Amino acid sequence: MTEHLDVVIVGAGISGVSAAWHLQDRCPTKSYAILEKRESMGGTWDLFRYPGIRSDSDMYTLGFRFRPWTGRQAIADGKPILEYVKSTAAMYGIDRHIRFHHKVISADWSTAENRWTVHIQSHGTLSALTCEFLFLCSGYYNYDEGYSPRFAGSEDFVGPIIHPQHWPEDLDYDAKNIVVIGSGATAVTLVPALADSGAKHVTMLQRSPTYIVSQPDRDGIAEKLNRWLPETMAYTAVRWKNVLRQAAVYSACQKWPRRMRKMFLSLIQRQLPEGYDVRKHFGPHYNPWDQRLCLVPNGDLFRAIRHGKVEVVTDTIERFTATGIRLNSGRELPADIIITATGLNLQLFGGATATIDGQQVDITTTMAYKGMMLSGIPNMAYTVGYTNASWTLKADLVSEFVCRLLNYMDDNGFDTVVVERPGSDVEERPFMEFTPGYVLRSLDELPKQGSRTPWRLNQNYLRDIRLIRRGKIDDEGLRFAKRPAPVGV
């Protein structure tokens, strides 16, 4: 007999742990399992193993709302973040619900039975289980393959070419010349870490620059409050301080982009040698927050540049050579190792497909509702975090809403909920109003968002608190239904 559960959660990273905790806390009678395709939990924090891996936002907002972050670092390294996620799962018994090596291949919705059949591959064997509600918490990255553009002459290079998503544990880079291609969060994390841990010299080669902000890796206010207040109270206070600060910076960038650009470049200039061409190497041709700001703790990247361990080169690649990279300017960069920190590939729902009564779902024709459900797909929610703030802020809100939704359905005898696509008064817009390369490459494969609430993705935690945490469940956009009574009853 096929196993049946009330809820199936896909993914055992931060989003999956949040979903499970909220289910246990707010829907304690619901049975559930977490399906994780990898051999261990932690998602991003277990997958990425490159030197220097760390958070790119503070842990008081990246941490769960329900469990305080107690580490000393506000900008934390990957290992303690992974331990935090794992220990949270163990503390609340969530780890007992995780089924590892369970890759979801497809999910089929039956209107007649009001349930999903989830098809799974585990150790080469196919199986299935059914559930009332499907909660997709696998993020939007392709965990199997990062983005690596084709570079002319790459076959000529005699050294290793490595993508950070697949970092070899035995890579020896001591006293080596390294070129890191890229300018995003991965590159600005890797470059100073490599320079400080044995590399002879590191070059960050970028086609165009990114806005970079330096921030202390410790929070002085948090340290004081932790001495004066109970743990949970101190954590909540610092969390709100940082939420409001993030919102204020983002709002200022939207209102006064030129002024904020000038301020960011001025702050960078103070940390670099006199005469350094900040505009060329750290002055993007777009406004702040059109793409995510990159964070460097304690100015580590700028310190490495000052000490001569790191050089930033802004140029384009002609081809790889046997001993490095030839640029279109004619310059050649010597390299023993080349690292392609060139981005990620987007992949919603872990690559799983969905059908409704045998008909394939084309998610590109759907519209997102509150950034967590898709039009026309019954009894399904997904978690995608913020692009301009910590991922977990949105993950916790989505988990809260799903629990409120399930309880509302139980209280009113409903078996299904589906998002109805709005009429022509709501204009279609791209799923993300965000322009990094990994998003632009995949926009045609993503759902749409709408021009107004609740179809518009706010990217605003304060607005989402009103909309998601405090808003009505039975509002515009959702249609609830009860299973028809059997004939003769």
From Swiss-Prot:
Keyword presence, Cell membrane: yes
Residues that hold FAD according to the record: 15, 36, 44-47, 56, 104
Binding site for NADP(+): 54-56, 183-189, 207-208
Species: Mycobacterium tuberculosis (strain ATCC 25618 / H37Rv)
Induction and repression of expression: Repressed by the transcriptional regulator EthR.
Key words of the record: Cell membrane, FAD, Flavoprotein, Membrane, Monooxygenase, NADP, Oxidoreductase
Annotated phenotype, changing residue 84 to C: ETH-resistant
Chief subcellular location: membrane
Description of the deletion phenotype: Inactivation of this gene leads to a strong resistance to ETH.
E.C. number: 1.14.13.-
The encoding gene: ethA
A GO term from the CC aspect: peptidoglycan-based cell wall
UniProt name for this protein: FAD-containing monooxygenase EthA
Cofactor, how bound (note): Binds 1 FAD per subunit.
Site note Transition state stabilizer, residues: 292
Spans through the membrane: none
Cell membrane recorded as keyword: yes
Cofactors, names only: FAD
InterPro entries for this protein: FAD-binding_MO, FAD/NAD-bd_sf, Flavin_mOase-like
Subcellular location: Cell membrane
Subunit composition and interactions: Exists as a mixture of relatively large homooligomers ranging from 200 to 600 kDa.
GO biological process, one term: xenobiotic metabolic process
Regulation: Activity can be increased by one order of magnitude by adding bovine serum albumin in vitro. This result suggests that the enzyme is activated in vivo by protein-protein or interactions with other cellular components.
SUPFAM superfamilies: FAD/NAD(P)-binding domain (SSF51905)
Reactions catalysed, as given in the entry: ethionamide + NADPH + O2 + H(+) = ethionamide S-oxide + NADP(+) + H2O
Function comment: Monooxygenase able to convert a wide range of ketones to the corresponding esters or lactones via a Baeyer-Villiger oxidation reaction. Can act on long-chain aliphatic ketones (2-hexanone to 2-dodecanone) and on aromatic ketones (phenylacetone and benzylacetone). Is also able to catalyze enantioselective sulfoxidation of methyl-p-tolylsulfide. In vivo, likely functions as a BVMO, but the exact nature of the physiological substrate(s) remains to be established.
